């Protein structure tokens, strides 16, 4: 494993060299932001170094609830939920939204968390060629009257190669076939 000697926003120091970190969660540099560090110290003093269990049993703190309320207020929604990682967010959200009467279609290069969420959902699981709108259209046409719900899932930016999805075209295609995106 590569040892990181120092974090600096989207950069790291490894072996005395400053490098761009393409796999960082802190691509906006917020891990070193003074306000974020101040609030983290406050949480450390109040709650210690971690929760006392998983959130569903005994791990939800006042900080979790306040964060979710602020997110919901910012978005103008009834509620929000914060997850500990993107992987868990994808896994639980996808598997909750879909069931055995639905179909989910995802790009062949989708992140593993998307694939796992799709498999856990019990929905019909289909994959289309990478960023290939014609292949997706073929799947959507075939699914037109066969399923209660249709969900198309893509990465906005594919983490393994940096490709960007054709979002405006995907929105139009999903709208045309009555699929969620």
Where are these regions (language model features)?
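N-terminal "arm"/small-domain region of PLP-dependent enzymes with the aminotransferase-like
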Residues: 1-49, 179
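Short, small-residue-enriched loops and turns at beta-alpha junctions
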Residues: 29-30, 57-60, 112, 133-134, ...
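Conserved PLP-anchoring active-site segment centered on the Schiff-base-forming lysine
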Residues: 93-112
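Short, structured coil segments at secondary-structure junctions
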Residues: 100, 120-122, 177
């Amino acid at each position: 494993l590569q040892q990181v000697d120092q974090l600096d926003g989207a950069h790291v120091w490894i072996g005395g060299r400053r490098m761009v970190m393409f796999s960082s969660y802190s691509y906006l540099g917020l891990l070193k932001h003074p306000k974020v560090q101040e609030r983290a110290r406050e949480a450390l003093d109040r709650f210690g170094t971690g929760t006392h269990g998983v959130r569903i049993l005994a791990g939800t703190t006042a900080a979790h609830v306040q964060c979710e309320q602020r997110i919901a207020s910012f978005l103008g929604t009834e509620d929000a939920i914060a997850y500990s990682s993107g992987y868990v967010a994808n896994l639980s959200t996808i598997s909750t939204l879909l069931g055995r009467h639905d179909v989910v279609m995802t790009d062949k290069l989708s992140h593993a968390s998307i694939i796992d969420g799709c498999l856990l959902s019990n929905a019909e699981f289909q994959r289309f060629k990478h960023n290939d709108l014609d292949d997706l259209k073929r799947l959507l046409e075939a699914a037109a009257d066969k399923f209660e719900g249709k969900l198309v899932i893509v990465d906005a930016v594919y983490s393994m190669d940096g490709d960007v999805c054709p979002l405006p075209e995907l929105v139009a295609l999903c709208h045309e076939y009555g699929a969620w995106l």
